[in-house]
Amino acid sequence: MLATPATADDDTGGHDARGLTATVKADAEALLPQGAPGVLVDVRTPGRSLKVRAGYGNLTDKTPVPWNARFRIGSLTKPFVAATVLQLVGEGHLSLDTTVEEVLPGVVRGNGNDGSRITVRQLLQHTSGLPEYLQEMPHLFTLDGFEEHRFDTVTPQQAVRLAMRHEPDFAPGTSWNYSNTNYMLAGMIIESVSGRTWQEEVRRRIVRPLGLTQTVLPGTRVGIPRPHAIGYERFAGPGATAEDPKYTEAIDATRQNPSWGGPAGDIISTTRDTQRFLRALIGGKLLRPAELAEMQRTVPTNGGFLSNWPGARYGLGLMWIPNSCGGSWSHGGDIMGYMTRNGISADGRRSVMVSINTDTLQRQPGVPAPVGDVTTELIDHALCPA
């Protein structure tokens, strides 16, 4: 399998730079037997920028992931949306304590769901208790269903109505549970408050000011602008268990209508642009100090999040993950064909972005399962110099 370090943009040229490149290269290669078709890693540190890639962006042609590949960032969309909401808060258009009912009257109602008891803060923090709309879209997670519905359009309004078929997971503010419904509503709130679509507001407030020229908010468009790796997807087969999903053969899932993710997960970007965004966000270039402090005020997570990232806490569209040198801010993303992982140090001086062209990893026989998330060691090595 191919594993190549980039040679450009290394300003130090010393032993430390070569050592970091070798370490990150080895970490990227280690993801291949875990089931990654291809890996692209981008590390930014003071005076240094390095990229490493491993495996293939196209398994048929045996070509590598392009250095400047665009990819679907999945739930890394959420910090873009949260930052946009927080800018509106800072401008006085609403507050974090504004209820959903005040902005979107009658939208969150039924089966015990009550928008008058849920605040904007609770949406962004996943403490609303709102059920997950994706449980009403099981076709996304089967081979036949995905092939039949991959080009369907799903609006945020439709997604929220699907969620309202279920009772809340808990009373607002009493617990934590990751639910994409929260961010569908956040996008709707942006539109109600601003009078523009959530995509227009994200472009106007974040994409254009930061010069994120490689970032696309696709809406219902099914393709990814070139260059890009093929996104591979596997689906659980008959008799699947958590330990053995009995995956089908991988299919090309690159072309799909991402509207089912909407403001919860449909953005397309690159390692350069996503790092520029996170560094600007943590560096205080997008939010006023008060709103950034609110974004970084965290609550404990639970369930699978703690299994993947022990000690993880969640703020307003940002996750804090402990590591060997303290911790980092992060938000991963998984969407059909693509997995994104990242981290940025608390001072914003070191950051790393990892793109894998599948979100369904199938380990090779005899390869042990990772402890926690599959990219944990790589991200730790990138952010925590030895």
Predicted regions and their residues:
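Hydrophobic (often cysteine-bearing) scaffold residues that line and stabilize catalytic clefts
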Residues: 20, 73, 77, 81, ...
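Residue-level preference for non-acidic, small/hydrophobic
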Residues: 28, 47, 81, 85, ...
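N-terminal carbohydrate-binding/catalytic regions of secreted carbohydrate-active enzymes
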Residues: 43-59, 63-64, 72
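Short, surface-exposed loop or secondary-structure junction motifs
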Residues: 112-327
